[in-house]
């Protein structure tokens, strides 16, 4: 996990805008406050042909005098796991960050702070591992040292302004604590979502909390991930897990660079906790909603909630299958898109982005690929035998 920092001075500011993108996933912080609410920015594109940048108004985050802009950079789809078997380095082997902060002063002058070799860098922050669908490994006691310097690199693609709906956090679900027949502790959030977990506990330094995520319990009422995993002698994926090593005292954690499909969370820890200490956060595109449903049964409402929480940057798919969020998302697209158009006024923006991916991802012959954005070594047919990665049919 790359950690970048730029310390700069500013005064008499009228407005400030931050332009940022990455080959990978980024999260920016100014003076201790998160920049924007876009989750897993800049989103997924075919990085060889199209990279989208975001623009943030950061005027209120800055102060007269010294300021610090810090950025965490993860592999994301660019270098992280893609496809049912978690293939790596599909678009490149070196994550990259591009940023430009424009400060407009009250006298009309403009000050620019841009990524260059003067930025501080280190890879010793609290997040030790972060992969799309496999999860995160976190050492809460770690603090980035920023003892190194950033390396200047390039990418042969001109960034374009983001034309899509940002992915943001939405519903927060409460947990119900249950004990399986074998005595394991599982949290039931009552609804299958795409998202991640958050918790706040008091612990001693070195204590561990391991979380594993899945959509269902098996026929015996036990936690299982067999319905979503592909397994061989060398690899089992997706892991859908978080391994958190505590610091002394209060520990607050929320997943940063991974997303899971789940309703149930297996908790393995010696840290004392209550179900109220945990929450599940649904993550999907921040579209303007026009449709709601009141129904006499929980089943009817769940039928609406399921597709409502699916869209993330492209058309619907499920995160644990972990394709590169393909624009032609197959069965999920055909099943849910017509419903989503009635629920969300801005659903057409996702379809516009899908068409853009199909266009930029065309073959040299001019024909569209089956599942854009398609990386170098992976081309998965958007036809599924069942809603399970373990039973996926490849072309």
For every predicted segment, state its role.
Residues 330:
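Aromatic- and glycine-enriched pocket-lining scaffold segments that form the walls
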């Amino acid at each position: 996990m790359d950690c970048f920092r730029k310390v700069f001075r500013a005064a008499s500011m009228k407005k400030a805008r931050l332009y940022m993108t990455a080959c990978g996933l980024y999260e920016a912080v100014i003076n201790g406050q998160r920049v924007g609410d876009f989750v897993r920015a800049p989103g997924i594109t075919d990085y060889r042909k199209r990279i989208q940048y975001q623009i943030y108004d950061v005027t209120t985050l800055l102060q007269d005098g010294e300021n610090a802009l810090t950025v965490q950079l993860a592999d994301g789809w660019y270098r992280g796991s893609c496809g049912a078997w978690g293939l790596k380095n599909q678009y490149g082997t070196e994550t990259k960050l591009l940023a430009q902060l424009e400060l407009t002063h009250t006298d009309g002058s403009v000050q620019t702070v841009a990524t260059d070799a003067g930025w501080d860098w280190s890879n010793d922050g609290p997040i030790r591992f972060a992969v799309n669908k496999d999860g995160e490994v976190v050492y809460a006691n770690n603090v980035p040292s920023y003892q190194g310097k950033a390396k200047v690199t390039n990418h042969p693609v001109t960034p374009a302004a983001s034309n899509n709906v940002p992915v943001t956090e939405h519903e927060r679900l409460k947990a119900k604590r249950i004990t399986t027949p074998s005595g394991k502790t599982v949290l039931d959030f009552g609804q299958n979502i795409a998202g991640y977990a958050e918790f706040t506990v008091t612990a001693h330094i070195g204590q561990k909390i391991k979380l594993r995520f899945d959509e269902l319990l098996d026929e015996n009422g036990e936690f299982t991930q067999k319905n979503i995993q592909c397994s061989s002698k060398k690899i089992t994926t997706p892991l859908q897990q978080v391994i958190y090593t505590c610091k002394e005292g209060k520990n607050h954690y929320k997943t940063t660079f991974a997303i899971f499909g789940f309703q149930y969370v297996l908790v393995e820890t010696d840290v004392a906790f209550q179900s109220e200490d945990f929450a599940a956060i649904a993550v999907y595109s921040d579209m303007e909603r026009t449709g709601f449903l009141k129904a006499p049964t929980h089943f009817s409402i769940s039928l609406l909630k399921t597709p409502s929480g699916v869209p993330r940057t492209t058309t619907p798919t499920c995160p644990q299958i972990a394709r590169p969020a393909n624009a032609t998302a197959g069965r999920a697209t055909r099943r849910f898109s017509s419903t989503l158009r009635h629920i969300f006024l801005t659903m057409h923006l996702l379809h516009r982005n899908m068409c853009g991916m199909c266009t930029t991802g065309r073959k040299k012959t001019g024909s569209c690929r089956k599942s854009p954005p398609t990386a170098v070594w992976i081309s998965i047919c958007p036809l599924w035998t069942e809603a399970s990665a373990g039973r996926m049919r490849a072309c």
